[in-house]
């Protein structure tokens, strides 16, 4: 399998100067003409796709304002679509918006809504549906996507199939924002999401949160040529990596996500199984501390923890080398604005001890972890614990239940294990994670200088200056934030050799969580 090696910003389709000067519209052909899967033969209809996935819980909902992990993303894209889709290389391409353009300055955007598309109920898609769906994440809402739309000043209906979005400050990345998985398009006025009424390929047949979800293909031809080939899809929640792998080996499922790096080389020897590896596009694995709470208020405590973790040993022993060193922020090496000059904190027990002494504490620091957070979280924490001993510091690794981890531990525990998924732009990486007051700012990091840099970088036309701004953002997080991001993993999926469409992607695993829509059986 060819590794995914490059991506543009992760890859705005247009030159930023041309786009902000007034981009020409993007057409339908860009969306579907060059899918790598097409090279594997003509798509065939039929069959039941069985998925075994990690990344969900019993508290999962069909409400797009609640999505936070892989399984909700995957099932939402069975039923609904977004305005914009991200292709395998990381480019923004048309989905329900057939084209878009911006006026000079990128503060006014016009999106042309595709005609002839209907929801499951038979209602025709129109501008009112799009405006309502975007507004679900604006104003009084707990949606994690609220921060992404903070600069949206007004959304205006220009015609039944055209809207204008006016921003308070220019943002050339707006199409990428509208590809965010929270931004699915629902009928105007929808308040009950338990019975999905979408423009997607499938309808809901069965739903047991935390157990499984079953979807059936809609009758007739799907509006995307070559897609929606399976008769039905069964997605099972399988949180244990060993159980997922065994389910694939014994033909109980057709594809799995988040393959354990420790077993992938052995699994690849199975002639009935193929591996999909998206190098550097996987999760950002970290331990995060709330820096408005003691003892993590102390910058020296955080520097002690950052110098006191042996990242290379974790990557070697937990990820079997299928990862790169993390820089204590979420921007990865595939991103155009990744600061290649930045050096990772070396494992230096003496320097860690110096900072702990300066802070007046060497622990114990309680770190809450669970395999429910991610496979390898516990082993990573134990290695962290051992590496800190050489700095004369104590780490108390507290193992907690995986059930409800994201509701009960994340954003609440002072120090815990977390992972962050990939995002197609630097702005999306930084805005949701580190800007003051954001719902998912899981370190409570707050720095006005950083916040201003993020805003200013969105509209900066000079690429060299923009690079400098993002480099400074990374430097600040590297030195100040409460994130100890020790590894950026490769996205590792595995599936049956008869399955087509399980390809590397620049953003998420399982072909951007669209395998149900994109795949077929040979």
Regions found by a protein language model. Give the residues of each.
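N-terminal secretory signal peptides
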Residues: 1-14, 25-30
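Detector for C-terminal structural segments
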Residues: 14, 26-27, 69, 208-212, ...
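Alpha-helical secondary-structure segments
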Residues: 50, 126-133, 160-166, 200-201, ...
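N-terminal lobe/hinge region of extracytoplasmic solute-binding protein
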Residues: 52-104, 135, 197-199
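Gly/Pro-rich hinge or "lid" segments in bacterial periplasmic/extracellular proteins
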Residues: 87-91, 178-228, 232-234, 240-242, ...
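Aromatic- and charge-enriched surface segment that lines or borders ligand/interaction sites
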Residues: 98-143, 158, 164, 247, ...
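Surface-exposed binding/hinge segments that line
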Residues: 112, 146-188, 206-208
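Ligand-site clamp/hinge motif
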Residues: 220-266, 385-386, 394
């Amino acid at each position: 399998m060819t590794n995914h090696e490059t991506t543009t910003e992760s890859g705005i389709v247009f030159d930023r100067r041309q786009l902000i000067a007034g981009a020409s519209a993007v057409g339908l052909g860009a969306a579907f003409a060059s899918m790598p899967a097409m090279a594997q033969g003509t798509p065939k209809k039929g069959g039941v796709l069985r998925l075994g996935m990690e990344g969900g819980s019993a508290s999962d909902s069909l409400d797009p304002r609640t999505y936070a992990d892989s399984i909700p993303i995957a099932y939402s894209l069975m039923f609904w679509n977004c305005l914009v889709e991200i292709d395998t290389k990381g480019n923004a391409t048309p989905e329900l918006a057939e084209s878009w353009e911006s006026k000079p300055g990128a503060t006014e955007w016009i999106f042309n809504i595709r005609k002839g598309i209907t929801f499951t109920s038979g209602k025709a898609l129109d501008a009112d549906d799009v405006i309502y769906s975007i507004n679900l994440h604006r104003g009084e809402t707990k949606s994690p996507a609220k921060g992404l739309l903070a600069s949206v000043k007004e959304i205006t209906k220009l015609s039944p199939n055209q809207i204008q979005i006016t921003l308070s400050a220019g943002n050339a990345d707006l199409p990428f924002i509208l590809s965010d998985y929270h931004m699915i398009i629902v009928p105007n006025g929808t308040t009950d999401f338990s019975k999905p009424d979408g423009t997607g390929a499938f309808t809901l047949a069965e739903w047991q949160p935390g157990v499984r979800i079953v979807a059936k293909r809609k009758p007739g031809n799907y509006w995307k040529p070559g897609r929606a080939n399976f008769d039905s899809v069964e997605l099972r929640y399988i949180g244990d990596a060993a159980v997922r792998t065994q389910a694939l080996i014994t033909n109980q499922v057709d594809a799995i996500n988040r393959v354990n790096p420790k077993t992938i080389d052995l699994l690849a020897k199975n002639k009935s199984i193929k591996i999909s590896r998206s190098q550097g596009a996987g999760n950002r694995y970290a331990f995060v501390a709330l820096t408005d709470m003691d003892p993590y208020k102390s910058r020296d405590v955080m520097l002690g923890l950052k110098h006191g973790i042996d990242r290379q040993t974790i990557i070697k022993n937990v990820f079997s080398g299928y990862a790169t060193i993390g820089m204590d922020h979420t921007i990865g090496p595939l991103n155009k604005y990744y600061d290649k000059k930045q050096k990772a904190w070396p494992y230096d027990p003496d320097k860690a001890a110096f900072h702990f002494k300066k802070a007046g504490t060497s622990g114990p620091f309680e770190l809450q972890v669970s395999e429910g957070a991610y496979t390898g979280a516990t082993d990573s924490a134990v290695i962290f614990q051992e590496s800190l001993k050489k700095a004369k510091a104590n780490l108390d690794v507290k193992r907690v239940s995986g059930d409800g981890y994201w509701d009960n531990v994340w954003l609440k525990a002072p120090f815990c294990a977390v992972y962050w998924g990939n995002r197609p732009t630097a702005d999306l990486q930084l805005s949701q994670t580190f800007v003051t007051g954001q719902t998912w700012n899981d370190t409570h990091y707050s720095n006005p200088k950083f916040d201003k840099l993020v805003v200013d970088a969105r509209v900066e036309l000079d690429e060299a200056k923009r690079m400098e701004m993002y480099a400074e953002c990374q430097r600040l997080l590297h030195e100040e934030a409460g994130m100890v991001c020790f590894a950026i993993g490769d996205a590792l999926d595995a599936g049956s050799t008869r399955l087509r469409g399980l390809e590397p992607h620049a953003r998420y695993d399982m072909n951007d969580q669209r395998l149900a829509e994109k795949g077929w059986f040979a």
